[in-house]
A protein has these predicted regions:
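A short helix/loop element that forms part of the nucleotide-sugar donor recognition site in Leloir-type
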Residues: 172-189
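Short His-centered aromatic/hydrophobic patch
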Residues: 89-96, 113
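Carbohydrate-associated surface elements
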Residues: 143, 165
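A conserved mid-protein helix/loop that constitutes part of the nucleotide-sugar donor-binding site
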Residues: 16-24, 194-217
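A conserved nucleotide-sugar
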Residues: 33-36, 185-186, 190-194, 208-238
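N-terminal strand-loop element at the rim of the active site
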Residues: 3-4, 8-70, 231
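Short donor-sugar binding/catalytic loops of nucleotide-sugar-dependent glycosyltransferases
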Residues: 11-14, 187, 199-203, 230-232
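A conserved, positively charged/aromatic
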Residues: 80, 107-140, 146
């Protein structure tokens, strides 16, 4: 492939690990002065992108309506041809099915499995399997790779493991004292104790219950755990 021309497809760019990874990849390419594209239905994280190098094209790719997928696929195909895109990276199951409706001539497709995706019904399993039909797959851990190899009968060499990370420079190191004091006061945090932060959406598969099960087996007299999601934080003294 003589040139690298990437589009990432993600349902929304509001918040979350999938969205953060999409923005981080786009900004890395922008730092290298490599033009790239994102197709999304929108979101507040768009403002974090460098519009000199990253072009955002808004389409309703967050839709769960399968009847709308052929029309969306046609529009994506037109966008790909108009911009000479040759690599398509889908980051969610819905967009994967949309791409599967396209004729994928002259493009390579990649999908990231950000988790193993639950669901025991036939329809749910089929929906989840859409990601596996791309040319190459990324798994965020060895566990995810082993699980999807077994679940979808995939060849291991079709999957690359790329562990998730964070850009520590993104976080505000100079948080003012008043903001810190307000957080401590609002959540009744005893600062004399060790504070553990678990940042993730509160849901059954993010691991909070397993974490609590482990932490309660320790000496917890001097520990406070903070479970934090976007615009919401819960302090639990264990």
């Amino acid at each position: 492939m003589s040139s690298f021309n990437l589009v990432q497809i993600v349902p929304t760019l509001d918040s979350g690990g999938v969205e953060r990874g999409t923005v981080d990849v786009a900004n890395f390419l922008a730092e290298k002065k490599i033009k790239n594209f994102i197709i999304t239905s929108g979101g507040k994280m768009i403002k974090e992108l460098d519009d000199n190098f990253t072009q955002v094209h808004q389409l309703p790719v967050a839709s769960k309506n399968f009847f709308s997928y052929p029309l969306i696929a046609r529009k994506i195909n037109q966008f790909i041809k108009a911009n000479n895109i040759n690599i398509v990276h889908v980051r969610s199951r819905g967009p994967a099915w949309i791409i599967n409706l396209m004729t994928k001539n002259n493009i390579k497709t990649i999908a990231t499995f950000h988790n193993v995706y639950g669901g025991n019904s036939y329809l749910k399993k089929m929906y989840n399997k859409g990601l596996s039909k791309m040319d190459h797959l990324v798994a965020i851990s060895e566990y995810v790779k082993k699980t999807i190899v077994k679940k979808y009968n995939l060849l291991p060499n079709k999957i690359s493991v790329i562990n998730r990370g964070i850009d520590t420079e993104y976080f505000n190191q100079s948080l003012d004292a008043e903001t810190k004091d307000n957080i401590i006061k609002n959540h009744k945090i005893d600062t004399a104790k060790k504070i553990i932060l678990f940042p993730a959406r509160i849901t059954s598969w993010k691991g909070q219950l397993e974490f609590i099960d482990v932490i309660t087996k320790m000496d917890t007299q001097n520990i406070i755990v903070l479970f934090a999601e976007i615009q919401k934080m819960r302090a639990i003294q264990i």
